[in-house]
Amino acid sequence: MNSNSIQSFDALPHNLRECFLDMASFLEDQRIIASTIIDLWSASYGKEGMNNLQDLASRNLLKLLPIGRNEYEDGFYNELLVKQDNVLREFAINQCLKESSSIFERKRLNLEIQDNKFPNWCLNPKQPIVINASLFSISTDDSFASSWFEMDCPNVEALVLNISSSNYALPNFIATMKELKVVIIINHGLEPAKLTNLSCLSSLPNLKRIRFEKVSISLLDIPKLGLKSLEKLSLWFCHVVDALNELEDVSETLQSLQEIEIDYCYNLDELPYWISQVVSLKKLSVTNCNKLCRVIEAIGDLRDLETLRLSSCASLLELPETIDRLDNLRFLDVSGGFQLKNLPLEIGKLKKLEKISMKDCYRCELPDSVKNLENLEVKCDEDTAFLWKILKPEMKNLTITEEKTEHNLNLLQLF
């Protein structure tokens, strides 16, 4: 590690220093989706996650690799990768070790289990194990048998599970993490991992964010957990197990949920009905789900929804007409929907709609009601822009921004 990097670390403000040290929770040689890190930081640093990433990058303490459009102002960070140099990661780990001579008193604790061999401090303890860390990271390899020991973790606010096995049982001691706010489960194996013992999450009164990456899961499992404090649910590259039976009303069960992100869930062909019952929802993003062919009519019940992102869903043919009931909708993204036939007939009723992103939607017909959308900004490609330019004389405040299609090789680093 060169002296410039050390000087950069020494000069960091306290909050950026903390953010840098948190990066040690992820495995080496990884390209991490920016949303993952921002979710992690949300437990301790609020909503400044993107600013912190950019500040650390400006000091050469990490690299930012865009894989798509730079529309971070909309709060969507799945199209940005973060890479940390392995030497910098080791430096961060060493700094964490200096926080306390006692493993149990460190602010951050990384537990690595290889070949089912636990560290010595886990074996035959003379007294119950109490972990006082606020950030706990557990990494296991593909041979892990999910055989856990008991421990008490009363102060853990953020939990990162780096897994590699095809089957993984969440440890029972998660239920002791009464202060837990963020759970991130990242599977580094070749195939989606089947998770079991999700019920240990149901007793966590402060859990606000859950992120699943590359796991096999039923979308019905989430409401069953009864997480009344959950604010954000994220699924990336997950295998979504079909559920035969829908749930009863979940509006009380998920009363705080404001944001759902579903990205690269390749076998998702339809959204579960319960999503339409989460009346607190403000952002719904379903992206890069190539089998999604329809959106449920009941989506019109989400009266507080402000952002609806249905981008790069290649099989999506139409949007439900009930979208015209989304009175608070400000941003609609259907970019990459090259099979989309038309926008909802009465989309012009959405008086708060400020921006539509519809790149590569050149087959989409625009209903006459779009003329009622005042101060509208449209982001699209050249061919789609032609559809809107025809309306320009009747839409004086219409802004059309043309974007070129770019092929970004950074995308290959995701897989």
UniProtKB/Swiss-Prot annotation:
LRR repeats lie at residues 229-251, 256-278, 280-303, 304-326, 328-351, 352-373. Residues 239-260 form a coiled coil. The keyword Repeat applies. Residues 8-43 form the NB-ARC domain. The keyword Repeat applies. It comes from the Eukaryota. Keywords: Coiled coil, Leucine-rich repeat, Plant defense, Repeat. GO terms for biological process: defense response to other organism. The LRR repeats probably act as specificity determinant of pathogen recognition. Possible disease resistance protein. Belongs to the disease resistance NB-LRR family. PANTHER family: PLANT BROAD-SPECTRUM MILDEW RESISTANCE PROTEIN RPW8, RPW8 DOMAIN-CONTAINING PROTEIN. This is Probable disease resistance protein At5g66890. It comes from Arabidopsis thaliana (Mouse-ear cress).
